[in-house]
């Protein structure tokens, strides 16, 4: 890991609530309009020459809605365009300039998949820690096994000083069990983007996770 910071990363809300992870500016625009306030842009298949513009536009849109927009992986562009925060996987921690991210005031979220990675994340004092994957998922190839709700509950209890995010295979039906662990946020991908009616799914999820009932 390069240039380890000697201070904690900027804090974020202890309970981030519903946290959709999407791959395009179009999805960010749709979800911010429905009342989502925490969101992640995880670009996967965009040509490299289009990535910066997509990130810049997403950050501007996030500011417009006063949202907590985290950029996955592209920490240099997140710094350059003044993102709210960055999300890094374990492999990204090795190459990212964590000191630069911390000094610019960006919030940092870190993925973890077991107790060892959780301990490593805590040592960096990030803004939030993602705990996963909780259930089997087809969104991303995972070398680790699903941890399940009981392990999630234990990890949340052992991480009281951090904002925590549950991620991995969480469907609408599984949300109540996940919330019952005390986790501060629920990250979802397919439950929204592959729903028959994404607006209805988002409204249901906002109600389940944050108690927000959308009008109209």
UniProtKB/Swiss-Prot annotation:
InterPro entries documented for this protein: Aldolase_TIM, ThiamineP_synth_sf, ThiamineP_synth_TenI, TMP_synthase
UniProt xrefs under Gene3D superfamilies: Aldolase class I
Cofactor note: Binds 1 Mg(2+) ion per subunit.
GO aspect biological process, one term: thiamine diphosphate biosynthetic process
Cofactor: Mg(2+)
Sequence positions that bind 2-[(2R,5Z)-2-carboxy-4-methylthiazol-5(2H)-ylidene]ethyl phosphate: 137-139, 169, 189-190
Signal sequence residues: none
Keyword entries, A-Z: Magnesium, Metal-binding, Thiamine biosynthesis, Transferase
Residues holding Mg(2+): 73, 92
Reactions catalysed: 2-[(2R,5Z)-2-carboxy-4-methylthiazol-5(2H)-ylidene]ethyl phosphate + 4-amino-2-methyl-5-(diphosphooxymethyl)pyrimidine + 2 H(+) = thiamine phosphate + CO2 + diphosphate; 2-(2-carboxy-4-methylthiazol-5-yl)ethyl phosphate + 4-amino-2-methyl-5-(diphosphooxymethyl)pyrimidine + 2 H(+) = thiamine phosphate + CO2 + diphosphate; 4-methyl-5-(2-phosphooxyethyl)-thiazole + 4-amino-2-methyl-5-(diphosphooxymethyl)pyrimidine + H(+) = thiamine phosphate + diphosphate
Positions that bind 4-amino-2-methyl-5-(diphosphooxymethyl)pyrimidine: 40-44, 72, 111, 140
Pathway: Cofactor biosynthesis; thiamine diphosphate biosynthesis; thiamine phosphate from 4-amino-2-methyl-5-diphosphomethylpyrimidine and 4-methyl-5-(2-phosphoethyl)-thiazole: step 1/1
GO MF annotations in UniProt: magnesium ion binding; thiamine-phosphate diphosphorylase activity
EC numbers, comma separated: 2.5.1.3
GO-annotated cellular components: cytoplasm
Catalytic EC class: transferase
Function: Condenses 4-methyl-5-(beta-hydroxyethyl)thiazole monophosphate (THZ-P) and 2-methyl-4-amino-5-hydroxymethyl pyrimidine pyrophosphate (HMP-PP) to form thiamine monophosphate (TMP).
HAMAP family recorded: TMP_synthase (MF_00097)
Family: Belongs to the thiamine-phosphate synthase family.
Alphabetical list of NCBIfam families matching this protein: PRK03512.1 (NF002904), thiE (TIGR00693)
Protein name as catalogued: Thiamine-phosphate synthase
Organism: Photorhabdus laumondii subsp. laumondii (strain DSM 15139 / CIP 105565 / TT01)
UniProt gene name: thiE
């Amino acid at each position: 890991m390069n240039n380890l910071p000697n201070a904690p990363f900027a804090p974020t809300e202890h309970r981030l609530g519903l946290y959709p992870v999407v791959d395009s500016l179009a999805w960010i625009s749709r979800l911010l309009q429905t009342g989502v306030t925490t969101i992640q842009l995880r670009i996967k298949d965009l040509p490299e020459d289009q990535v910066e513009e997509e990130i810049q536009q997403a950050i501007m849109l996030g500011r417009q809605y006063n949202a907590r927009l985290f950029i996955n992986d592209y920490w240099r562009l997140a710094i350059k365009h003044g993102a709210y925060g960055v999300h890094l996987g374990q492999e990204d921690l090795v190459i990212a300039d964590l000191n630069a991210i911390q000094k610019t005031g960006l919030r940092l979220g870190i993925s973890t998949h077991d107790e060892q990675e959780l301990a490593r994340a805590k040592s960096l004092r990030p803004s939030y820690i993602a705990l996963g994957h909780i259930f089997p998922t087809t969104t991303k190839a995972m070398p680790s096994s699903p941890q399940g709700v009981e392990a999630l509950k234990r990890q949340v209890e052992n991480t009281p000083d951090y904002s925590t995010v549950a991620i991995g295979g969480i469907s609408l039906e599984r949300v109540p069990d996940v919330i019952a662990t005390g986790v501060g946020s629920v990250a979802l991908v397919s439950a929204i983007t592959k729903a028959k009616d994404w607006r209805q799914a988002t409204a249901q999820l906002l109600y389940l996770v944050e108690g927000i009932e959308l009008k109209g």
